[in-house]
């Protein structure tokens, strides 16, 4: 198969291929960018594989960065863009179900492609638009099939994260897993416990944010792989509650997706759960806030104080989840409440602790903090203008 017109992303990278070939080596576009070009999907990173060894690649180009040279990858800076050029390679025995014990550089494209995960990702593209397909990846693309390259069990034993990638690709592409590939994913699922939580989180997160997340999640659940993810043993029945969300619903942000997961699981200790997933504190706070907002909305309408206490984006995300559940929503009420706030944080108050100490002789300590909190709430609730004279008069009256 040949692409008559190369997508612009490849055309911009052609000078890199041409320089490598002019130096006497082979070079091809490889991986996800080729797959996405053939599917007419947006292309993100353009990766290049070459028969040139890293030191040879560095001699070809004026500006390079050693980003993963031990694995054969050199970052080439060309035409104000960055391209990863990786030497054709083979990999020895995997010591931890994630990293090969040894990487060997080779001059053969076939040897390089046969180590890849799925046939649709084992395609190469030359400078003329000719697709090199050694594992029937084009047929699988046409038939919307996810099939492991070679023996599926070997691929997943080499790198167990490929199991999560398989579910993620399902969610992204709406493809079906080939029977033997799915069977190997089920058999190798216990190996997921050997993979770093951070890497699993990235794949699971991408799955949840993908357009066909239901398909990927269903495969993750039915395969039993969910049993080997942090704190999710025995969670299948509860996670199936996510399928009750509106059929056309897509999560708008990671924190929203994970809040929905937390709510489906009825997690009581959100911080503890997300700590096991090793998320950032900022992310955990957003997810926890969303769970709290959902609890508030299940009991009453939101108030000005709620709009002050929680980020407007999170309030709207929580409302989106309610809408997906078929519950009553009022987006305009939230926006109106937010717009009516006199202040959105305590830094916007006309007074601070230092001013009160100077004006009224307050000492640092709990009492001063209590007064500031009372002022903050009075201003937010609309009981007190955010005006210096009014605030001072309010304090005088309370003294």
Curated annotation (Swiss-Prot):
| CDD domains, A to Z | NT_ClassII-CCAase
Q: What is its EC number?
A: 2.7.7.72
Protein name (Swiss-Prot/TrEMBL): CCA-adding enzyme
GO terms under biological process: RNA repair; tRNA 3'-terminal CCA addition
Question: Self-association or partners: how does it assemble?
Answer: Homodimer.
Keyword Transferase found: yes
Say which species the protein is native to. Answer: Streptococcus sanguinis (strain SK36)
User: Where does the signal sequence lie?
Assistant: none
User: Sorted alphabetically, which keywords does the UniProt record give?
Assistant: ATP-binding, Magnesium, Metal-binding, Nucleotide-binding, Nucleotidyltransferase, RNA repair, RNA-binding, Transferase, tRNA processing
Task: Please describe what this protein does.
Answer: Catalyzes the addition and repair of the essential 3'-terminal CCA sequence in tRNAs without using a nucleic acid template. Adds these three nucleotides in the order of C, C, and A to the tRNA nucleotide-73, using CTP and ATP as substrates and producing inorganic pyrophosphate. tRNA 3'-terminal CCA addition is required both for tRNA processing and repair. Also involved in tRNA surveillance by mediating tandem CCA addition to generate a CCACCA at the 3' terminus of unstable tRNAs. While stable tRNAs receive only 3'-terminal CCA, unstable tRNAs are marked with CCACCA and rapidly degraded.
Query: Which cofactor does the UniProt annotation name?
Result: Mg(2+)
Task: Say which enzyme class the record assigns.
Answer: transferase
Q: Which residues of the sequence carry a binding annotation for CTP?
A: 32, 35, 116, 159, 162, 165, 168
One Pfam family hit: tRNA_NucTran2_2
Gene3D superfamilies per record: 1.10.110.30, 1.10.246.80, 1.20.58.560, Beta Polymerase, domain 2 (3.30.460.10)
Q: The organism sits in which domain of life?
A: Bacteria
């Amino acid at each position: 198969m040949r692409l008559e017109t190369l997508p612009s992303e490849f055309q911009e990278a052609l000078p890199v291929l041409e320089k490598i070939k002019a130096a006497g080596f082979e070079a091809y576009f490889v991986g996800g960018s080729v797959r996405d070009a053939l599917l007419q999907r947006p292309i993100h990173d353009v990766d290049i594989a070459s028969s040139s060894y890293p030191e040879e690649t560095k001699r070809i180009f004026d500006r390079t960065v050693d980003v993963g040279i031990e694995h054969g990858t050199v970052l080439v800076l060309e035409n104000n863009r960055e391209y990863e050029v990786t030497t054709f390679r083979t990999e020895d025995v995997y010591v931890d179900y994630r990293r090969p014990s040894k990487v060997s550089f080779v001059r053969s494209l076939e040897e390089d492609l046969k180590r890849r995960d799925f046939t649709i990702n084992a395609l190469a593209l030359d400078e003329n638009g000719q697709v090199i397909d050694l594992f029937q990846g084009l047929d699988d693309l046409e038939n919307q099939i996810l099939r492991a390259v070679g023996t599926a069990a070997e691929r997943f034993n080499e790198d167990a994260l490929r199991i999560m990638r398989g579910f993620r690709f399902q969610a992204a592409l709406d493809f079906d897993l080939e029977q033997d590939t799915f069977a190997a994913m089920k058999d190798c699922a216990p190996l997921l416990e050997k993979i770093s939580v951070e890497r699993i989180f990235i794949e699971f997160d991408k799955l949840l944010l993908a357009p066909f997340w239901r398909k990927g999640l269903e495969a993750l659940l039915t395969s039993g792989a969910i049993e080997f993810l942090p704190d999710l043993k025995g969670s299948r029945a509860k996670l199936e509650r996510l399928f009750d969300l509106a059929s056309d619903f897509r999560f708008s942000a990671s924190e929203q997706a994970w809040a929905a997961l937390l709510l489906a699981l009825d997690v009581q200790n959100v911080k503890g759960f997300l700590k096991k997933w090793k998320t950032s504190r900022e992310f955990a706070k957003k997810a926890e806030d969303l769970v709290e907002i959902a609890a508030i909305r299940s009991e009453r309408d939101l108030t000005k104080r709620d709009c002050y206490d929680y980020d407007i984006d999170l309030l709207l995300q929580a409302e989106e989840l309610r809408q997906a559940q078929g519950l009553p929503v009022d987006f305009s009420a939230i926006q109106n409440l937010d717009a009516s706030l006199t202040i959105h944080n305590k830094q916007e108050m006309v007074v601070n602790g230092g001013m009160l100490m100077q004006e009224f002789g307050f000492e640092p300590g709990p009492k001063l903090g209590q007064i500031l909190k009372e002022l903050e709430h009075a201003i937010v609730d609309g009981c007190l203008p955010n005006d210096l004279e009014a605030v001072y008069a309010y304090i005088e009256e309370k003294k």
